[in-house]
């Protein structure tokens, strides 16, 4: 390879990345999933597009995709709160195992019929497209404030369901490649145990060792992210080499690191955020270059039928069956989880496996997987926000700081500096600082007015345009968001949580004459909190709601995981 060729490679690669970044701003305004934009740039630069770049190296695409997926899952794990496992772990694991198996079976039968394949070949197609994609889910849910049970279930499912898809794909490839020799039950059992057991053990064990190492050595701030990234990739590679799930390993490694105090935490998260964006862009650009759209025309109609069959039939059935034991999920929750069965890079990566194994119909599997991913991103990705609102699982947003950064007062410090800009609609504008009900342990470190830094006292009145710098912890963000929230411009947002708010220990009997409740012998002795448990179970999250006596009852406030306030929404505002 000549120096000129290398330079052209750098130029073209940088141009494609820059175009992808610039178009991402447009995608958010028109409602197109950003991953679809990256994929589209790659397709346009490819063989059938204006760019005319010929790229058909599946091994390079496999390498880039695996590396990118590892970085994305490491970052996703570090941003997942263990506290969300309280309501989401077992449902997510049920979806990640039984759900994937059911989706594989149903999709496989449809694929066998639509593409005139035998049942094993059809099941292989089902296994390839059977798992949701972490990159797509993390990307499209970012910035959306969903019901914690629903959001955490989707994120944990997407981070942990790939081992099942890999297990099914590898097993079916082995059966198809064995040409009548068969595959023993012991092989299948050991493969399953290796994928999940070894992947989990190496991820948690490697994460603990890396956490110990980070906190025992002193490095320049910029080297901590390098250490985390290299350590994560080491565990990812070792797990894959030993037959475990590297994807599960690096996700659990990130989960362990993200939920423990460690040096350089904020620098690590900041650098990983940029690396994750670069990984998403690089992965979908390469996959877009790999695709030749003209090849999809031959499979377009049956692949479209398969994609919609999976979206409207296979995924909903698998979700409802997998979540049967979990009564805390409402019908709306289940329908939304069914709709967010986003497919992304993982099915395309798995579709490379048959090509590397030299199976017949390998190109067909690849083209079908690519078509299913395109339809999923277009149909499910573009409608995700509307689906969340229709299912009533999206909570009203609270303002986040315009900037937040770590304050390294001591090595494991979890102090942060939050910066808020006060617009004219903020509740607190015009109020003296002494009247602000600041969360315990938080402090206003500075107040900027114009270009001047003021030294505020309790009598200082806040004005439009002021910038407040607040010292606090991550747990204070919700309270600070409420404190610096805007006056409602639309009435429906505050009324999401109800028109009136009640303490959970109030007896229903005392509310009956006010709201016209008709109470039977059992209900007249119940409190509001006991009514919640009766209808929703005891694992409650913000925004949980049910209809009773023509009223909507909504969990409106929690403290340390316990419900303290319930909102009542009147019928004409439902």
Swiss-Prot record:
PROSITE patterns linked: RCK_C
Keyword Cell membrane applies: yes
Predominant subcellular localization, coarse grouping: membrane
Transmembrane segments: 6-26, 30-50, 58-78, 95-115, 119-139, 163-183, 191-211, 219-239, 242-262, 271-291, 301-321, 335-355, 364-384
One Gene Ontology term of the molecular function aspect: potassium:proton antiporter activity
Cellular component terms per the entry's GO annotation: plasma membrane
Localization annotation: Cell inner membrane
Domain RCK C-terminal: 405-486
Membrane topology (UniProt): Multi-pass membrane protein
Catalysis performed (reactions): K(+)(in) + H(+)(out) = K(+)(out) + H(+)(in)
One Pfam family it belongs to: TrkA_C
Biological process (GO), any one: cell volume homeostasis
InterPro entries reported in the protein's UniProt record: Cation/H_exchanger_TM (IPR006153), FAD-bd_PCMH-like_sf (IPR036318), Na+/solute_symporter_sf (IPR038770), NhaP2 (IPR023729), RCK_C (IPR006037), RCK_C_sf (IPR036721), Transptr-assoc_dom (IPR005170)
Keyword Ribosomal protein set for record: no
Keyword annotations: Antiport, Cell inner membrane, Cell membrane, Ion transport, Membrane, Potassium, Potassium transport, Transmembrane, Transmembrane helix, Transport
Similarity section: Belongs to the monovalent cation:proton antiporter 1 (CPA1) transporter (TC 2.A.36) family. NhaP2 subfamily.
Role played: K(+)/H(+) antiporter that extrudes potassium in exchange for external protons and maintains the internal concentration of potassium under toxic levels.
Cited HAMAP family: NhaP2
Name listed for the protein in its UniProt record: K(+)/H(+) antiporter NhaP2
């Amino acid at each position: 390879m000549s120096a000129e060729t290398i330079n052209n490679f750098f130029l073209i690669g940088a141009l494609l990345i820059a175009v992808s970044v610039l178009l991402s701003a447009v995608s958010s305004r028109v409602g197109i999933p950003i991953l679809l934009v990256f994929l589209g740039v790659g397709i346009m630069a490819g063989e059938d597009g204006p760019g005319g770049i010929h790229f058909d190296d599946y091994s390079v695409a496999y390498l880039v995709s695996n590396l990118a997926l590892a970085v994305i899952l490491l970052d996703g794990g570090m941003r997942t709160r263990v506290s969300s496992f309280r309501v989401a772990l077992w449902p997510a694991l049920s979806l990640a195992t039984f759900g994937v198996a059911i989706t594989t079976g149903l999709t496989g039968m449809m694929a066998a019929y639509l593409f005139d394949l035998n049942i094993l070949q059809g099941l292989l197609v089902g296994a390839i497209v059977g798992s949701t994609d972490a990159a797509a889910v993390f990307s499209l849910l970012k910035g959306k404030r969903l019901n914690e049970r629903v959001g955490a279930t989707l994120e944990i499912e997407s981070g942990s369901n790939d081992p099942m898809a890999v297990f099914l794909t590898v097993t079916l490839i082995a059966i198809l490649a064995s040409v009548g020799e068969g595959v023993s039950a012991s092989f299948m059992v050991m493969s399953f145990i290796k994928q999940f057991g070894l992947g989990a053990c190496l991820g948690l064990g490697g994460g603990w060792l890396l956490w110990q190492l980070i906190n025992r050595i002193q490095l320049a701030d910029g080297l901590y992210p390098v250490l985390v990234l290299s350590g994560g990739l080491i565990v990812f590679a070792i797990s894959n080499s030993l037959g475990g799930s590297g994807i599960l390993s690096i996700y659990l490694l990130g989960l362990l690191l993200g939920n423990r105090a460690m040096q350089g935490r904020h620098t690590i998260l900041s650098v990983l955020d940029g690396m994750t964006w670069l990984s998403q862009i690089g992965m979908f650009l390469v996959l877009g270059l790999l695709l030749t759209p003209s090849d999809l025309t031959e499979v377009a109609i049956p692949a479209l039928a398969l994609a919609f069959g999976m979206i409207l039939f296979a995924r909903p059935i698998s979700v409802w069956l997998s979540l049967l034991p979990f009564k805390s999920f409402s019908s709306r929750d289940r329908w939304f989880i069914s709709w967010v069965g986003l497919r992304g890079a993982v099915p395309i990566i798995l579709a490379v496996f048959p090509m590397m194994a030299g199976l017949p119909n390998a190109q067909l599997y690849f083209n079908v997987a690519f078509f299913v991913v395109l339809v999923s991103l277009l149909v499910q990705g573009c409608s995700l926000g509307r689906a969340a609102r229709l299912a009533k699982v999206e909570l009203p947003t609270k303002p986040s700081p315009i900037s937040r950064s770590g304050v390294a007062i001591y090595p494991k410090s979890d102090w942060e500096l939050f910066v808020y800009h006060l617009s004219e609609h903020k509740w607190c504008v015009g109020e003296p600082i002494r009247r602000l009900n600041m969360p315990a342990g938080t402090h206003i470190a500075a107040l900027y007015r114009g270009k001047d830094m003021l030294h505020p006292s309790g009598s200082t009145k806040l004005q439009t345009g002021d910038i407040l710098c607040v010292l606090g912890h991550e747990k204070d963000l919700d309270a600070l968001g409420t404190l610096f929230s805007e006056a409602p411009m639309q009435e429906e947002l505050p009324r999401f949580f109800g028109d009136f708010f009640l303490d959970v220990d109030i007896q229903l009997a005392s509310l009956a004459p006010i709201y016209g409740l008709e109470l039977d012998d059992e209900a007249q002795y119940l409190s509001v909190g006991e009514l919640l448990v009766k209808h929703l179970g005891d694992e409650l999250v913000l925004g949980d709601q049910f209809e009773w006596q023509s009223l909507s009852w909504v969990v409106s406030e929690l403290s340390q995981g316990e419900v303290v306030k319930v909102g009542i929404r009147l019928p004409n505002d439902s």
